[in-house]
Structure formats: C-alpha cells, structure tokens
Amino acid sequence: MFKFLRRLIGAIIVLAVIIVAGGFAWVRVVSHDRVYEATEAPYRDVALVLGAGLTPDGTPSTYLSGRLDEAVTLYNAGLVSVILVSGDNRTTSYSEPDAMAGYLVEKGIPREDVIADYAGLDTYDSCYRARDIFGVTSVTVIGQSYHIARAVTTCQMLGLDTVGVGNEQPHATSTWRWGIVRELGSNVKLIADLIQRREATIMGSQETSVTDALARHGR
C-alpha cells in the first residue's frame, strides 16, 4: 500500500511539473515576436493598461504607475490612439480605473482618449471585455515584464490582434519574484479558462466609448 501511494504521489508530481512547464512554454510560443519596448512597438488602435493596485492614498502603485508611463510613451509617439484602463472598482472608495485615468490626464493625455473599464478583475476579464464590451480588435496590452507573455497570449487567444509592452521597474523586489512564481500557476489557469470558454466575471451592455474615440482619430 505504501509503495502504491508513493508511486501515485510521484506520478502526480511529474504530471504537475509537465502541466506547469507546458503552460510556461506555450505562452512564450504564442507571444513570441509580440513583445516590444514602448518606443519600438508597432501601431495598435488601443493601449490596454491592466490594473496593479493602489497605494493607501488612492494613487497608482509603483507597478501601476510604471505601466501607465508606458502608455503615455505609446500615445505620445502616435503608436496608439486610445488608452483603455482596466481594473478593479470593488467599492465606491477603491477605483483603479479612476486613479489610472487621473494619472494619465495629469501626464497630458486628453481625457476623451482615456476610457475606463471598471470590471477588469483579472487579465482574462480585461481582454475579454475589451473585445466584447468595448469592441476592441487591435491592442497593445501593458503590464509588468514578468507576466506580459501571458497577457499577450490571453488577448491574442481571445481574438485580438495583440502586441505587448512590459514595464521593468521596480525589478529586484520580493513582490517581483513572487510575481514570477505566481505566473506558473496563472499560465495553467489561462489554459483552463480558454478550454472552458469562460466569460468575463462581469459582462453588461456593449459600449461605444472606444470606437467613438477612435472615430475622432479617423480610425
């Protein structure tokens, strides 16, 4: 009995390693040649900035402000026309999208070119809603560099013409290292979400805010 259990546990461990390693390799194959520095990215209609938390005073976290700065670079270089900020709005006093929009406006981005998605609860939901709620077809997704391969893969597999920009700062922190480890499980979850064809957690009516903004740019 003990020998059987030991073999069973060993088989489970081997299977888990294969699944995790397979997920890691798969997202890198899909995202290959689709990740760029902001100044070198090809044009896409929309920059999709993924939420990354707020400080206690309600301003974007260090990670989030880094992502937003990448969006500013893309917009000012004419590499995107609209910025879609997608994050958590769990309570009336916690709104990542509002904080993100305010940050961008302070950086000189016209408010009419900043669109807020208040139900981007995770990367999958943000990409899904960008497509089905906001009508986005062409996107530069922005996150930290340790998870940009998965972000690009998520949007690409959901049918968006996707490239990605990964912010590198701050790099040498325990949060960054934990993020790298967490990605291993997140890759597997993405595969499960795609197989199950999961909808975004929160859907709602279609919006024309992105397409209206693009129309003002002649897109």
Region locations from a protein language model:
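Compositionally biased, low-complexity repeat tracts
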Residues: R6, I18-I19, I83, L160, ...
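N-terminal type II signal-anchor transmembrane helix
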Residues: M1-T39
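A structural signal for short, hydrophobic/glycine-enriched beta-strand patches
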Residues: W26-I180
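Extended hydrophobic leader/signal-anchor segments used for secretion and membrane insertion
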Residues: A11, A41-Y43, V188
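Short linear elements at protein peripheries
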Residues: R198-R219
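A general structural signal for short secondary-structure boundary/capping elements
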Residues: R90-E96, V163-G166, G185-D193, T208-L214
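A transmembrane-helix-recognition feature enriched in membrane-embedded lipid enzymes
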Residues: R177-E199
